[in-house]
Amino acid sequence: MKLRGLYAITDSQLLAGRFLSHVEAALDGGVCLLQYRDKSDDAARRLREAEGLMKLCERYGTQLLINDDAELAARLGVGVHLGQTDGPLTPARTLLGRQAIIGSTCHASLELAAQAASEGASYVAFGRFFNSVTKPGAPAANVDLLEQARAQVKLPIAVIGGITLDNAAPLVAHGADLLAVIHGLFGADSAQEVTRRARAFNALFAS
């Protein structure tokens, strides 16, 4: 599977009361990867929401990933995204199998990206590139890093951190394969606007 396009990431608080409807609206607009991100300790709700997302992703032909929970990913038979504090990647690869999509947060570090590649990552994620509501204190990255990563790391490159339709184009131009977006997509006032934004993000890859 070619990893290129919009990488939608959920936020359960942002999407409260409209979780599945807005996610489906995004999928209708075109989503390459969908990451279920929920940092709460409510395991039952997380399983229920993840199962709902899995059904939607199957309907739209989108790959689902779970943030920071390889065991839940294994239970559902989907991929996982791991941050630098979420444990090593190799055990997750062993647990999920060779075909699973596994992503790794690399902040602004080519060294972390090289390590992730050596451990079997499917893609590497750099950021934050702009001011981020979700992770305001994350290390900053810039477009020069993307060109260096393109030359050194032979994996798809995801970018994250404050990405909107107003600032995403230069990231794609400098080598980003995946635009990982939370508020810039799901912060829309209506499901119709979520769909419009999803299509607009994907259009950046067609130009």
Curated annotation (Swiss-Prot):
Its Enzyme Commission number(s) read 2.5.1.3
Chain residues that bind Mg(2+): D68, D86
Q: Which reaction does it catalyse?
A: 2-[(2R,5Z)-2-carboxy-4-methylthiazol-5(2H)-ylidene]ethyl phosphate + 4-amino-2-methyl-5-(diphosphooxymethyl)pyrimidine + 2 H(+) = thiamine phosphate + CO2 + diphosphate; 2-(2-carboxy-4-methylthiazol-5-yl)ethyl phosphate + 4-amino-2-methyl-5-(diphosphooxymethyl)pyrimidine + 2 H(+) = thiamine phosphate + CO2 + diphosphate; 4-methyl-5-(2-phosphooxyethyl)-thiazole + 4-amino-2-methyl-5-(diphosphooxymethyl)pyrimidine + H(+) = thiamine phosphate + diphosphate
Annotated positions binding 4-amino-2-methyl-5-(diphosphooxymethyl)pyrimidine: Q35, Y36, R37, D38, K39, N67, T105, K135
Q: Name one GO biological process term.
A: thiamine biosynthetic process
Q: Which family does it belong to?
A: Belongs to the thiamine-phosphate synthase family.
Q: What is this protein called?
A: Thiamine-phosphate synthase
Q: Can you name the source organism?
A: Pseudomonas putida (strain GB-1)
